[in-house]
Regions:
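Active-site-proximal alpha-helical scaffold in enzymes
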Residues: 87-117, 170-199, 253-259, 346-367, ...
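N-terminal extracellular/periplasmic Venus flytrap/periplasmic-binding protein-like
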Residues: 11-12, 22-27, 31, 40, ...
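Active-site pocket-lining segment
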Residues: 53, 164-167, 200-203, 273-342
Length: 388
């Protein structure tokens, strides 16, 4: 198998629900990043062999195959193909993994991969009725969670909401409210410090004058977080403050074979080492990064102690802390630039976003081994290892 390198990694600012990016279609968010990536990498648009793009929704303006839409809207030649990848929250990460495997197998030299999501613009949907004249019809909000579910799924696994799965993880792995709030505070503090130090500047593509993430709250405190009511369970621990919000954004990376890299004379951001995914019970989907990370580490012979930097997507503080505990990873290396609780979690974008942040930080710090990992709705986890 051939070596695969990252030569560019960029993202939009992450917008709040109904915030500064809510007027921008998801295909336009994707196109803006694809266009910028080609320019940043200094490659000719026609050199791109494939675009793989993640999207978790696919019910609205992402228009079935947002990857192909992004190719054409970005002005790439019509000869450049595009395929959309959906592993829910890990869609952007899965797109990168598919791209890396395509290059490693010798089927491509240069691939653009990433993901986008506009949760602000996610549509409501109506199922097509079996009866031509139904007495009533249900409408589904496609922003997050279950929709138009097979009744057999309820019988087999139940249908806990994302927040309810976080409560389940908190209970099973004994992650208390105070610890969750402390983790959320750290996320905001670290993200604010990284933003103010200019650490995100090299990542961000300006969109209509927006240049920074909207959700970072530098002024939050444990006192403020402690006052928030639990959302999913009366005697629970999960609140809006220790959970990731709903967001809009896009992120992507350019991957190259070693031969293409040598011809380009570009300095790589890092090397793709390996990726893996794993399944868990849907009720504890938040613990998914544990088996996924263990699988990918075993695949390459690394140990958890070999890692110097880690990006763990913070769907909920409860699950992130449970993952840290179960992996035995040093908490100090996890999300030192903040995470999704502060920055945001636009579903299909997030896997590519955390890889982008990880690679830029490793270049800045000089660290050589990194992990990006995340939980996935309906009981999965995904992980990618990189090195410099």
């Amino acid at each position: 198998m051939r070596s695969v390198y990252f030569v560019a990694a960029r993202r939009t600012p992450i917008g709040k629900l109904r915030g500064a990016l809510s007027h921008v279609r998801p295909d336009d968010l994707a196109a803006a990043v694809v266009r910028d990536l080609v320019a940043t990498a200094g490659i000719e648009p026609g050199q791109v062999d494939e675009v793989y793009w993640g999207a978790a929704n696919q019910a609205g303006e992402d228009n079935r195959n947002v990857a192909r839409m992004a190719v054409l809207l970005a002005g790439l030649p019509e000869s450049v193909p595009g395929a959309t990848v959906n592993r829910l929250c890990a869609s952007g990460m899965e797109a990168v993994t598919v791209a890396a495997r395509t290059i490693a197998s010798g089927e491509a030299e240069i691939v653009v991969a990433g993901g986008s999501e506009s949760m602000s613009r996610a549509p409501f949907v109506l199922p097509r009725p079996d009866d031509g004249l139904p007495n009533a019809m249900s409408i589904a909000d496609t922003r997050l969670g279950w929709r138009l579910v097979n009744a057999r799924m309820r019988e087999l696994h139940g249908l806990l909401s994302m927040g309810e799965t976080a409560e389940e993880v908190a209970q099973r792995y004994k992650v208390g409210r105070e610890r969750q709030d402390e983790f959320a505070l750290r996320s905001h503090q670290n993200a604010a410090a990284a933003r103010d130090a200019g650490h995100f500047a090299g990542e961000i593509v300006e969109i209509d004058g927006v240049t920074s993430d909207e959700g970072i709250r530098a002024d939050t405190s444990l006192e403020k977080l402690a006052k928030l009511k639990t959302v999913f369970k009366a005697d629970g621990t999960v609140t809006a403050g220790n959970s990731s919000p709903l967001n809009d954004g896009a992120a992507g990376l350019v991957l190259m074979s070693e031969d293409a890299l040598k011809r380009s004379n570009l300095e790589p951001l890092g090397r793709y080492v390996a990726g893996a995914s794993a399944g868990v019970h849907p009720d504890v989907m938040g613990i998914g990064p544990v088996p996924a990370t263990q699988k990918v580490l075993d695949r390459v012979g690394w140990k958890i102690g070999d890692l110097q930097q880690a990006e763990l997507n913070e769907a909920f503080a409860a699950q992130a802390l449970a993952v840290v505990d179960q992996l035995g990873i040093d908490p100090a290396i996890v999300n030192p630039s903040g995470g999704a609780i502060a920055i945001g979690h636009p579903l299909g974008c997030s896997g590519a976003r955390i890889l982008t942040t990880l690679l830029h930080r490793m270049r800045r710090t000089g660290d050589t081994r990194g992990l990006a990992t995340m939980c996935v709705g309906v009981g999965q986890g995904s992980a990618v290892l990189v090195e410099r």
